[in-house]
Every structure is written in structure tokens, then in C-alpha cells.
Amino acid sequence: MKRIATPSLTSRLLVAARSGVSPATAAIRSRSAISVRSQSTAALAQHDASHDLNNDRFPPLEPLPPAAESLPSPLPERALTSAKLAALHARLNLSPKIPLQTLARTLVDASADENPQFNNANLAFVGQTLINYHIAEWLLCKYPRLPQGILFSAMKAYAGPKPLLQIARSWGVDTAAVPGGEVDPGLLQFDALKPGVAITNFGYKRTELAYLEKFKWRRGMASRVVLDDDFGDVVRSDPKVAADLEKAMEEQDQDKTPDEEEAEMVANEQDQDVSYDRYGNPDTRAAAERAHAYFVRAVVGAIYAHCGREAAKAFVKAHIMSRTLDIAKLFEFKYPTRELAALCAREDFEPPVARLLSETGRQSRTPVFVVGIYSGSDKLGEGAASSLDHARFKAAMNALKAWYLYSPGENPRVPSDMLEEGAKPWTPAYIDMGEVISR
């Protein structure tokens, strides 16, 4: 009797059937065994060699010091190995005199690290002073007849927190999710939930600030110049002082009727619902805006500290003053005809007279009237609108804008030009006596 030659797999299935194991389970075990046996020592050696090759090409990162994670900001020596920081230094075309450690310090906000020796508060104060000074002297010499309120608005449009935020983003600066010692020094580090230490601003803190915001008291231009900051805005009090004032106001408001309290609660709930969206709440957005603005100011302060006055002025001109701003859109007149009449009386001009220059479609749905404002034989302004009164108002507004936006030239000399070596003798700049009607 001849034996039948069966494959090894079939024999294992037969053995499994005798032992009570299902054929499917036996097949799976056999496949796993086959796959395990197919591996060899040569394959393992080849895998280890490729792993070593990758380590040679891409070495692992250097381990951080044991106490780095507990620090509020990265160590200064880590700035020398940051690719982001080196790229930012080259992108801004900074001088080699500015070390990477100083540039890394400009990226550490006071809310991330409260130590003034490691954050950018001091550099930001120097930079803020330089930026506001150069922009103020340039605006005053270029537009000597600007009203004080428009001057404040123009300065804020150039050097306020929002334009500085746009400048920082145009530089390609990324933000860290959470500040700490393990963060890359090339990232902007700030705490969105903690206000931090604000830099010192010029101006005085009003004791009536809480009542000023609640009752919308009017602030005169003289008080804005003397008491408020460089942009004519109210200098905010410390959080503790503001909380005490708010608590005192709440105690005075205890005599409200139930209907008034219910209406106020509904309004507060609506404000809370609107304040939170996909981009955070107003507090976190304000913290990010403030951190970016402090960073730009700190960069200017670092340039001044390491490279001098002229380098800082050139940087401000290239990155801040070069931005386009239509100052004519900042004007808002309430009584343009009365203000124009007062201006003509102050300057000893003949009283302004409105004259109809041309018209079309008076009896149609879309008439157009062109009105000109004349002082004697001199034409002061011209405006077109769908009604005679509106055209007269537009002509008066255009005449006032033409007066206030007078400029002696595109690049006038400023007082800081006298600090240069070999500067020409100073010629006093023309500065107008100011606006006609104070707003």
C-alpha cells in the first residue's frame, strides 16, 4: 500500500481537526508562523544601517536643560540655534551689530515673563517714544494746519496698536500657543489670559475714568493734550483701581428699579453672546494686538540701543511712515459752512459766497448740482450733489480740507534732521495757529 504525499499545510489542518481546533484558526496560526520565520538577521542588519544613516543626516535635537521647561521664557543662549530667529533677522535686514539674543528678547512679552531683564518692556518703551516722536514731527511739518484731533487720529493710524499688528504680521512673525522655556525663541510669546505689566505711557490717569466711560462725558481738546496719551486716548488705570471704581459705582446704582436691572442683565447677556466667536473674545484679541505692537516697538528700541539714532529713524521711515494713509478721510465736519465763515473772518478774507456753477436734470429723479464757494474772486472749493444744500455743504467741506491739508512739500525738513553731521542751518517750520472751531 502506497502512502499519499500531502502538503505540510494540509497535514497541519488534519492535525488541527483531530485536536479540536477549527481549520480557519489553524490557517491563521500557520500564516503568522510563516511570516515570523521568513524574517532573517540580514534584514535586521539592513534596517539598523538605514536607521543609523538617517541619524547621520538628521541628527536628533539637543536635549533641553532640565530646568528649561519650568522657565517662563527660553534661555538667551538658545537664540543662537533658532532658525526662525535667524530668518527674521535677515528678513528685516537688521545690522550685524544687533545680536540674536536681543532680537529674541523683543519677542518675549511682559505677560509671558514678568522679569524686566528678559522681557521687551524697556525696549518697547524706548521704541514707542522714538516712533511717536518721528511721526509727530513729520506730520506737523508736512501738514502744518492739521487740527489737533485729526493729528491724534493720524498718529494712531500710523503708530497705533492695529497698524503695528499688521506690520508685525507682514514680517512673518508667528505666535506661540503657550509661553514657556521650551518654546522656540523665534516665536512671539505672550499670555492671552494675563494682561502682564504695561509699559509706562505719557499722560495722567484720570480719577473720573469710570464715570467718563459710563456717562460719556465730553473731553475737551485741551484736556486731551495735557492729560491723555500720545494719541489723545484716556490713560487706563490699574486693574485694581478700576475694579474699586466699578464697585463704588455699583453701590451707587443699587437704587435701580427691577425693570432697569432686568434690562441691564439682558443687555449684558447679549454682549457676552456676541463677544465670543471662532477667533476668541475681545480680551484675547486685544492681548494679541498689544503683544504684536510691543514687539514692533521693541525692535525699534533694540535698533536704537545697538545701532544709534539714525538707524532707528531710517527703520521707522522704511516700515511705518512709508504706509499710505488718506488723511482727508479722517475729517468729519458738523457745521462746514459756519466753520468756513469763521475761517475767512479770522484770515481777513471776504465772506464766502456759494454760487451755482452748473446743473442737470432738475426735474428728473437724479438731478446733479455743482456748487462753488467763492471768497471775492477766489474759488475756495467745489462740490456736486443731488440737492443744492448738500452740494453747498460738500463745497464748504472741500474748501476746509484744502485749507487744513496744505503741505509745503513731500519731504519737509524736520527738527531731528539737525542732529545729523554737517546739517544745514535750521529754517523754522511754518506751523498754523490751529483749527477754527474746537471739537
Curated annotation (Swiss-Prot):
Localization: Mitochondrion
TM region(s), chain numbering: none
Subunit structure: Component of the mitochondrial large ribosomal subunit (mt-LSU). Mature N.crassa 74S mitochondrial ribosomes consist of a small (37S) and a large (54S) subunit. The 37S small subunit contains a 16S ribosomal RNA (16S mt-rRNA) and 32 different proteins. The 54S large subunit contains a 23S rRNA (23S mt-rRNA) and 42 different proteins. mL44 forms a heterodimer with mL57 and stabilizes rRNA expansion segments 1/2 at a membrane-facing protuberance close to the point of attachment of the ribosome to the translocon in the membrane.
Biased composition (Basic and acidic residues): 247-257
InterPro entries membership: dsRBD_dom, Ribosomal_mL44_DSRM_fung, RNase_III_dom, RNase_III_sf
Pfam family, one: dsrm
Main subcellular location of this protein, as a coarse class: mitochondrion
Region Disordered, annotated ranges: 39-73, 247-282
Keywords attached to this entry: Mitochondrion, Ribonucleoprotein, Ribosomal protein, RNA-binding
Cellular-component GO terms for this entry: mitochondrion; ribonucleoprotein complex; ribosome
GO biological process, one term: RNA processing
Biased amino acid composition, Acidic residues: 258-274
Protein species of origin: Neurospora crassa (strain ATCC 24698 / 74-OR23-1A / CBS 708.71 / DSM 1257 / FGSC 987)
Family according to the record: Belongs to the ribonuclease III family. Mitochondrion-specific ribosomal protein mL44 subfamily.
Keyword Endoplasmic reticulum listed: no
Gene Ontology molecular-function annotations: double-stranded RNA binding; ribonuclease III activity; structural constituent of ribosome
Alphabetical list of PROSITE patterns matching this protein: RNASE_3_2
Gene: mrpl3
Domain of life: Eukaryota
Function, in words: Component of the mitochondrial ribosome (mitoribosome), a dedicated translation machinery responsible for the synthesis of mitochondrial genome-encoded proteins, including at least some of the essential transmembrane subunits of the mitochondrial respiratory chain. The mitoribosomes are attached to the mitochondrial inner membrane and translation products are cotranslationally integrated into the membrane.
Listed name of the protein: Large ribosomal subunit protein mL44
